[in-house]
Structure formats: C-alpha cells, structure tokens
Amino acid sequence: YGQFANLGDAAAAMRRLSTGFGPVPEDIWLELCSHMVRQLPDGALTLHYDPAIGEPIRAMTQEAAQAAEAVVWGLYDQIQAQVLLIRGMESDLLTEATAQAMTLRGPRARLMQWPGVGHAPTLTAPEHMREVADFLLGPLA
C-alpha cells in the first residue's frame, strides 16, 4: 500500500481500497484518512494499521474457526446490556444469517442494516447518525 505524498493522495488510495464503506463525501474521507496514516521521517505518509489484518483469520482451518466461533457465541450469549448491531448490507464478513442469529439469542441485538455499505459503516450519513442516536438516547423529536 506504500507511501503517499500528502493526505489527499492517501485518502484517494483508501477510497479505492475501501469501496465497502459506502458513499462517503470527500471531506469525510480526508478526516477518516487522517486517523489511518502516520508520517514517516522523510515527511511521506503511510498506513497506520496493517491492511493484512484479516489474513490470520482467513488462514484458519475449519476446525479452528469452528472452535473460535463457539467461544465467541458463548461470550455473546452472556452479554446483559442492550446491543445495537450495525450491518452494512454489502458486508463480506458479517452475513445476514449471523446478524439474524444475533437478534434471536444472547442479548437479542437490535439490528440496523444499511444498503450500499460494506463491513465498516462510517456513520457519517445523517440518517445513520440519527438511528444510532435514537438507540443511545431514545427517539429525539
């Protein structure tokens, strides 16, 4: 993913790599990207996280994945607080079936799904922010 001369170049690259974030205005991309890069000694910018973060999960054997999933479900089932589950409908990680299961067990999450958004909703659309605020604060008139 390399280095970038400036924040605009980094934001453009992240936008190309992160189409699953959904529709995000340019000024928001710049703000998001400012938290995703770090400056190198020569002044160039580089990513502040490992873009290959998911590789170990993809490399798991089926048995290891099933064991890990059982542990995660066991922990999820113990949650006592209200849970808001936000799912971008284009997510390649959180399936519709898993999201629905999360509404039926454990804390019985309240599910919000947004079309045109992938696994990492940015919560920058006013209607998305309003829905989250309604969950956290109660409906505001």
Locate each region found by the language model.
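Soluble or luminal CAZymes and related metallo-dependent hydrolases
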Residues: 2, 6, 64-71, 94, ...
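Conserved alpha/beta-hydrolase catalytic His-Asp/Glu region
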Residues: 2-59
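Catalytic histidine-centered segment of alpha/beta-hydrolase-like enzymes
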Residues: 114-129
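Generic structural signal for secondary-structure transition and capping sites
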Residues: 19, 81-84, 141
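C-terminal alpha-helix
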Residues: 131-139
